């Protein structure tokens, strides 16, 4: 898992990226898999309102670029629940993200299709 200090979002990185060097805008998070599920952590860090409020209080910087200081990340309080509940929440979060991605693609295709039909209608009427 890596955290972008600029976007303030966490993501799971594929094993193909093991050993790569991170820029200063990213922080690697190591896990004790018996204690905290990675997908549950992603949900908490990216979407859970309690953690969002904590992150907002920690922001530093000027202008458009506000970042979370690395030292502040250790102070974020993560609600720990049973591992089975963490896994359920993490899987539900992953499915929600996947569904949103599919819906975004569908929306884009629908817009392209509609625009194509409308443009063709305009071209056909000009003749």
Which residues fall in each region the model found?
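Generic structural signal for buried aliphatic residues
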Residues: 1-3
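A short beta-sheet element
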Residues: 5-45
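A short glycine-rich beta-alpha junction/loop motif
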Residues: 6, 20-27, 60-84
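Amphipathic alpha-helical segments
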Residues: 37-42, 71-108
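Glycine- and charge-enriched low-complexity intrinsically disordered segments
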Residues: 38-59
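Short, surface-exposed recognition loops or helix-turn segments adjacent to catalytic cores
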Residues: 56-61, 106-109
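Short amphipathic coiled-coil heptad-repeat segments
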Residues: 102-127
């Amino acid at each position: 898992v890596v955290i972008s200090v600029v976007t303030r979002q966490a993501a799971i990185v594929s094993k193909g990226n093991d050993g790569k060097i991170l820029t200063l805008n990213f922080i690697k998070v190591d896990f004790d898999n018996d204690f905290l599920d990675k997908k549950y952590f992603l949900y908490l860090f990216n979407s859970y309102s309690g953690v969002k409020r904590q992150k907002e209080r920690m922001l530093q910087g000027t202008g458009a670029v506000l970042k979370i200081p690395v030292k502040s990340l250790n102070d974020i309080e993560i609600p720990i629940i049973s591992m089975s509940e963490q896994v359920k929440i993490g899987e539900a979060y992953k499915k929600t993200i996947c569904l949103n991605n599919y819906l975004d693609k569908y929306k884009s295709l629908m817009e392209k299709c509609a625009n194509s039909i409308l443009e063709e209608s305009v071209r056909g009427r000009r003749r």
